[in-house]
Amino acid sequence: MTDSFKRYLFIYRYSSYTKYIFGYLQIQLRVILSVGIWTFSQTNLQAAQLNENTKSSPLNTTQYDLELSKPLPYGFLIAAPENFNPDLRVPPPLPKPPENSNPPKTSTEPAKPSAVLESINTDYRYDTDNFGQTNLFIEPTLQFRLRNGNKIFVKTGYDFFEQRGVESVSNFPLQVGWEGKIGQVTLKTAAGVDVFDRLPTAINLNAKVDVPILPARVSPSGQLRSLLVVSGNLEQGPYKSNARTLENQITSWRFGPDLYWQIDRNTSLFSSLRLGNYNDGNSEVQTFSRLERKLGQFSLAANLFTWSYDRDLERTSGYFSPPDFLVYNAEVAWEGDIAKFLRCRLAANLGRQRLKGEFDNANTYQTRCTVKLSPNIEADLGYSFSNVRNQDTGESAYGGNSLTGQLRVKF
């Protein structure tokens, strides 16, 4: 070993090429050290970036979701801004660990489920009139939220239809739906079956598309100032008007647009058009418009409803099919808090209705209360009486009663 060292020392002193070789080795050593230092710094930087990317975002998600204190009429859905999908994020590549490093410890935290139960809403409706017709609807809907922000709905329940001169009909609906976003457009679709106790099973489906024309503007207090949304609707299934209509196995296709315009924070306009085709060869055109102005806890509204069928088939098919039906009225309403856990609304509609060229009074009286049972549970209970016709009663006066409710449970 000593002889070898002396030999290398001798070469260093006397060889003419030794200076160049040693200089080359010095340069190579500097390059290796520089690359090593740079690689080490980049590894720490990538690790810091990776740690930063894996942290949850501090943004409040309520900035992206608009929730109104009062739902829009007829279950109208407001398009919310696009949901952020964390699954689409691509993290930076992991640096290669040193050969002598220990393997990373696996996380003991359970993986997040692909779907989480978000809420259960149970709708209740009991309709009766002075001609012996009864319709009952009890339909719970389970809502699941997926990891990408989309929603899945499962709807089932029990419906019952009773009418004079007709055997009663029981219905067990089952429907599965999906709601998601494509850009700023909200799409909702559903399909299912209606199972009856003594009638053939029928298929049902519906679809809805919400397109925001003017984006929502919200005040610092959270009140909606302006918004314009246009919707497209498509529905198909059994026409659940009464027991006789179901016994005749009447089905319909209905489609048409909706428009909701929040003109300012106290004024809104809702308008709807429906075109319908029935399997008995009949067709319909239905329109509804409502202009509402809020005055503190009070509100004033004007309603206009038209309904016309190509043919009057009530005697053969069983459903109300007027060739020319018109209803217009004015509404006065009050809504406010009775207690911290109780909020109620009272409304009266006074107007006129026209059927087959004959005019008559058209009045409706409504009340609804919302009870907050807990932070995650609340219930609605409402009652209404109306003499707006739902069937052709000739010279006899018509009177209909509706008891409605909804139980909402959030998880």
Per-range role (PLM):
Residues M1-G23:
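N-terminal secretory signal peptides that target proteins for export/translocation
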Residues A48-E331, E335-L373, D380-K410:
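Transmembrane beta-barrel domains of bacterial outer-membrane proteins
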Residues T2-F5, L45-N51:
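N-terminal acidic, proline/glycine-rich, low-complexity intrinsically disordered segments
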Residues M1, L29, V230-L234:
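Generic low-polarity alpha-helical segments
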Residues D3, R7-Y8, R30, G36, ...:
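N-terminal leader/targeting segments
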